[in-house]
C-alpha cells in the first residue's frame, strides 16, 4: 500500500504542469494571450453588469460572450498568420540565401 494515496506523481519522463504550460506557450504564444483576453473581457463585462441600464440580463450576457469569442478568434487568426509567415515566407527567404 502506498503512503500517499491521494497524491499522483507523474512518471520521470513527463513534464509537470508548469513546464508543460511554458513549453506550450513557447510553441504557440498567442493562445495564452487569447485566453487572457477572454478573461479580461468577461471580467470587465460582468463588472459593468450593474450599469447595464434597461438592457435585459440575457442580452448583456450574450454580448459578453460574443466579445470574449471575438478576442479568442482574433488571437487564433493572428497565431495562424504568424505560423504561415514563419513556415512559408521566412523559411523561403532563408532557403534563398543559402
Swiss-Prot record:
Coiled coil regions in record: none
Domain of life of the native organism: Eukaryota
Entry annotated with the keyword Transmembrane: yes
Transmembrane stretches, start-end: 29-46, 61-83
One of the record's GO cellular component terms: membrane
Keyword entries, A-Z: Membrane, Transmembrane, Transmembrane helix
Pfam families: HIG_1_N (PF04588)
Subcellular location: Membrane
Residue ranges annotated as Cytoplasmic topological domain: 1-28, 84-98
Residues in the Extracellular compartment per record: 47-60
UniProt keyword Transmembrane present: yes
Topological relation to the membrane, as annotated: Multi-pass membrane protein
Residues annotated as domain HIG1: 1-94
PANTHER family given in the database record: HIG1 DOMAIN FAMILY MEMBER 1B (PTHR12297:SF9), HYPOXIA-INDUCBILE GENE 1 HIG1 -RELATED (PTHR12297)
Identification of the protein by name: HIG1 domain family member 1B
Organism in which the protein naturally occurs: Mus musculus
Amino acid at each position: 500500500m502506498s503512503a500517499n494515496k491521494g497524491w499522483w506523481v507523474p512518471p520521470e519522463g513527463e513534464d509537470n504542469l508548469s513546464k508543460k504550460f511554458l513549453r506550450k506557450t513557447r510553441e504557440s504564444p498567442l493562445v495564452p494571450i487569447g485566453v487572457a483576453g477572454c478573461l479580461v473581457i468577461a471580467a470587465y463585462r460582468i463588472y459593468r453588469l450593474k450599469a447595464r441600464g434597461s438592457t435585459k440580463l440575457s442580452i448583456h450576457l450574450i454580448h459578453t460572450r460574443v466579445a470574449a469569442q471575438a478576442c479568442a478568434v482574433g488571437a487564433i487568426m493572428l497565431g495562424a498568420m504568424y505560423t504561415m509567415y514563419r513556415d512559408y515566407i521566412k523559411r523561403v527567404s532563408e532557403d534563398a540565401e543559402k
